[in-house]
C-alpha cells in the first residue's frame, strides 16, 4: 500500500529539477500521485476501508494545492508535469 523507498528514489530522480532536489513541487506531486494510485487499488478491493479513504482525500487535496501553486508559478512546468503524469487537469 505504501510506496517503497526504491520507488520513491526512482520518482525523485525522474522528476528532480536539480541534483539535490527532493522537495520541489514536481517531486512532491509525483510521489503523491504514486501514493494515490496505490491507495486507489487498495480501495477497489477493500470498499469499506473508510479510514484509508479519508487519507486518500487528504492526499488528493494536498496534490491539488501543489498543482495550483505550480500552475500559478510556472505554467510550462505545470503543463509538462500534467502530461508526464497523465493527469486530467
Curated annotation (Swiss-Prot):
**What GO terms are given for molecular function?**
rRNA binding; structural constituent of ribosome
One of the Pfam families matching this protein, by short name: Ribosomal_S15
Q: What biological process terms from GO does the record include?
A: translation
What InterPro entries does this protein map onto? Ribosomal_uS15, Ribosomal_uS15_bac-type, uS15_NS1_RNA-bd_sf
SUPFAM superfamilies per record: S15/NS1 RNA-binding domain
Q: Which UniProt keywords apply?
A: Ribonucleoprotein, Ribosomal protein, RNA-binding, rRNA-binding
**Coiled coil ranges:** none
Q: Gene3D superfamilies annotated for this entry?
A: 6.10.250.3130, S15/NS1, RNA-binding
Provide the Gene Ontology terms for cellular component.
cytosolic small ribosomal subunit
Quaternary assembly: Part of the 30S ribosomal subunit. Forms a bridge to the 50S subunit in the 70S ribosome, contacting the 23S rRNA.
Record-stated family: Belongs to the universal ribosomal protein uS15 family.
Function, as annotated: One of the primary rRNA binding proteins, it binds directly to 16S rRNA where it helps nucleate assembly of the platform of the 30S subunit by binding and bridging several RNA helices of the 16S rRNA. Forms an intersubunit bridge (bridge B4) with the 23S rRNA of the 50S subunit in the ribosome.
What is the name attached to this protein's record? Answer: Small ribosomal subunit protein uS15
This protein's species is Bacillus pumilus (strain SAFR-032)
Amino acid at each position: 500500500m505504501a510506496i517503497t523507498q526504491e520507488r520513491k528514489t526512482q520518482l525523485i530522480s525522474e522528476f528532480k529539477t536539480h541534483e539535490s532536489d527532493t522537495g520541489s513541487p514536481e517531486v512532491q506531486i509525483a510521489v503523491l500521485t504514486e501514493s494515490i494510485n496505490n491507495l486507489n487499488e487498495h480501495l477497489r478491493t477493500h470498499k469499506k476501508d473508510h479510514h484509508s479513504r479519508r487519507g486518500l482525500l487528504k492526499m488528493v487535496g494536498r496534490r491539488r494545492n501543489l498543482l495550483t501553486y505550480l500552475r500559478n508559478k510556472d505554467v510550462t512546468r505545470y503543463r509538462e508535469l500534467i502530461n508526464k503524469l497523465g493527469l486530467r487537469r
